[in-house]
């Protein structure tokens, strides 16, 4: 970071408001900006045809069948959004203790990947590597008799899931499970299979946060999880040095990009990661963050577009190279009008 210097002059020789006087000057000296290419659009997919299921806790967001996914992707491409991130809402009868549907080559996500890459080869497709949408217990891995997740056995399943996604044509995989060693295992499997171009966006710093509730509604894991939590594998919200260790480990194991999740409550961590490592760094504006802003805007307490754009710009100012956000389409539409 640049060394802090004293301001060279005092009032009235220095009048900082001169640089705020009009729109062209403010634009000229603006330090950070937001564009559509900074946005990644998360989408929830489910089975069916011409079927959209609104998510009550995420106003404006729906689970969508694959035909509707393609319509959404078309708009994303037209707006200049470079990447779509896929998340599945799996039928309850397909959920098992080991989440085996996660590595079914004819499963929902592989079919969604193939459909997207066939229709929009220029669109990046990011897939989620985690078992919680597929497990009957709502956890991100394979539990032992006490309910504690078995790390190494889970990693073996995650490798199978990541390989299934890569073979379907995913450009990027996003391991969000927080198991130890999973990045290295996935990278080695990719190398062995010749998937040398498949990128890994590691959810390196995923906090044990209360902001994930609406997402769990969306993928149908909330009821399965019940009153259990994920504190034995997600990062403690009080820790930031630990976050840096997680990032260092994932980079050493072969991650191409890293992520901090949630976003706004952890902008300090985004800044530390970017300053310490200087690698492509992303933040996830998670479902709870989105829901809070939506609720406040719906009640007239905040202006929707203003706080949406301000919140996204905050990620860029903190050092993020891009943002996964459910506001992606709305923000890109607004940017196009500007």
Predicted regions and their residues:
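Exposed beta-strand/loop interface patches that mediate assembly or binding
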Residues: 12-18
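Alpha/beta enzyme core
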Residues: 2-10, 22, 31, 35-40, ...
């Amino acid at each position: 970071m640049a060394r802090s210097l004293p301001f060279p002059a005092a009032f009235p020789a220095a009048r900082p408001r001169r640089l705020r006087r009009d729109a062209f000057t403010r634009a000229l000296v603006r330090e950070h900006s937001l564009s559509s290419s900074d946005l990644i659009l998360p989408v929830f997919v489910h089975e069916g045809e011409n079927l959209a299921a609104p998510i009550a806790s995420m106003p404006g967001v729906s689970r969508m069948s694959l035909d509707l996914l393609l319509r959404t992707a078309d708009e994303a491409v037209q707006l200049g959004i470079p990447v779509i991130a896929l998340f599945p809402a799996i039928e309850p009868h397909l959920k098992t203790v080991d989440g085996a549907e996660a590595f079914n080559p004819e499963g929902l996500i592989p079919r969604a990947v193939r459909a997207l890459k066939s229709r929009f080869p220029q669109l990046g497709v990011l897939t989620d590597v985690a078992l919680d949408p597929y497990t009957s217990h709502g956890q991100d891995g394979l539990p032992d008799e006490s309910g504690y997740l078995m790390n190494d056995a889970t990693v073996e399943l995650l490798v199978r899931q990541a390989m299934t996604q890569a073979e379907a044509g995913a450009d990027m995989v996003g391991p969000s499970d927080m198991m130890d060693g999973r990045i290295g295992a996935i990278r080695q499997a990719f190398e062995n299979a010749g998937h040398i171009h498949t990128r890994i966006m590691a959810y390196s710093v995923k906090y044990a946060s209360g902001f994930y509730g609406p997402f769990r509604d969306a993928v149908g894991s909330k009821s399965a999880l019940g009153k259990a939590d994920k504190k034995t594998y997600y990062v403690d919200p009080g820790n930031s040095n630990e976050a840096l260790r997680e990032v260092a480990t994932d980079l050493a194991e072969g991650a191409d990009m890293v992520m901090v999740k949630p976003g706004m409550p952890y902008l300090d961590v985004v800044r530390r990661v970017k300053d310490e490592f200087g690698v492509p760094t992303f933040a996830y504006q998670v479902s709870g963050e989105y829901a809070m802003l939506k609720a406040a805007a719906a009640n007239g307490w905040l202006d929707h577009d203003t706080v949406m754009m301000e919140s996204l710009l905050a990620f860029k100012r903190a050092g993020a190279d891009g943002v996964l956000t459910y506001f992606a389409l709305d923000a890109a539409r607004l940017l196009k009008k500007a």
